[in-house]
UniProtKB/Swiss-Prot annotation:
Localization, UniProt: Cytoplasm
Protein name: Lipoyl synthase
SUPFAM superfamilies attached to this UniProt entry: Radical SAM enzymes (SSF102114)
Annotated organism of origin: Prochlorococcus marinus (strain MIT 9215)
Family recorded in the similarity comment: Belongs to the radical SAM superfamily. Lipoyl synthase family.
Binding site for [4Fe-4S] cluster 1: C54, C59, C65, S295
Length: 310
């Protein structure tokens, strides 16, 4: 039976849906960024010709993260070979060569920024035989050389179900392997037409089976038309496929050509899903709030690694 931790006064918010989903509620407003500190991070990234998912995907937390000197690096170019209708990253299906200098430049950025924890992600590169696995491997290797104390989190695509490519990624020995499931099963064809719900779950399970000591992570969005029961079932599926950490955030439509927001989920509802995941299912951590994104405050994983050493 699900434990309920919310006061009666908060219960009414659990199923509240905005009548005008185009109008953001108060809790989705972000603080004005500190432009000087943002400029320092942006300048460094520009000098080293590096992309970030913060910029390419129009993340609402870019001000906070850049101001604190952190960023999620986006490797293998700023354009994706898929055109998911929720995503703001550019689309390009053409075959493109990888830049062999990218791993070195990324490692230099990590060193200059003195990062204790780095998140490396990529666009989908379905034009590559290994989906970009070898580039992930090289990036981890170069970061380890220049910053051996830095913990590394990889946020990878599904690699088209190429399990040999997945093993190559895992052979680089990241501290955290993240692959986002993004939405509930019933919405997959609509939200991720080139993805596959079960393939994502299989990737997460195979990750833990091949590399048991890695911390596994996945995330998804609310507000695309899912029901609360579907969210609970999704959390159960992730737990049954050996996921340690989950992130849950509000979907925000990038523009009129993208999927519209179906509802704005209130903060108490996010808390409800967090407590269900941690207390009922036993996840190591569920980070759940309207502005949560998969790499938001990712550096806090180091606290979990100390609490749950492997």
């Amino acid at each position: 039976m699900i434990k309920i931790y919310l006061d009666e006064a908060d219960q009414s918010h659990l199923t509240s849906i905005s009548k005008n989903a185009a109008t953001k509620p108060e809790w989705l407003r972000v603080k004005a960024p500190q432009f000087e500190r943002i400029g320092n991070t942006a300048s460094l990234l520009s000098d080293l010709k590096l992309n970030t998912v913060c910029q390419e995907a129009s993340c609402p937390n870019i001000g906070e993260c850049f101001a604190s000197g952190t960023a999620t690096f986006l490797i293998m170019g700023p354009a994706c070979t898929r055109a998911c209708p929720y995503c703001d990253i550019n689309f390009d299906r053409s075959k493109r060569d990888l830049d062999p200098t990218e791993p070195h430049r990324l490692a230099e950025a990590v060193s200059r920024m003195n990062l204790k924890h780095v998140v490396i992600t990529s666009v989908n590169r379905d034009d590559l035989d290994d989906g970009g696995a070898s580039q992930f491997f090289q990036c981890v290797s170069e970061v380890r050389k220049k910053s051996p104390e830095t913990t590394i989190e990889l946020l990878i695509p599904d690699l088209c179900g190429n399990w040999q490519a997945l093993e190559l990624v895992l052979d680089s020995k990241p501290n955290v392997l993240n692959h986002n499931i993004e939405t509930v099963k019933s919405l997959y064809r609509k939200v991720r037409p080139q993805g596959n719900y079960q393939r994502t779950l299989d990737l997460l399970k195979r990750t833990k089976e091949y590399f048991p000591s890695v911390y596994t992570k996945s995330g998804f969005m609310l507000g695309l038309g899912e029901s609360d029961d579907e969210v609970l079932n999704l959390l159960s599926d992730l737990k049954n496929h050996f996921v340690d950490i989950v992130t849950i955030g509000q979907y925000l439509s990038p523009g009129p050509k993208h999927l519209p927001v179906q509802r704005f989920v209130s903060p108490p509802k996010f808390t409800y899903f967090k407590l269900f995941g941690e207390d009922n299912l036993g996840f190591m951590q569920v980070v759940s709030s309207p502005l949560t994104r998969s790499s938001y405050h990712a550096e806090e994983i180091q606290k979990l690694m100390k609490k749950y050493p492997r």
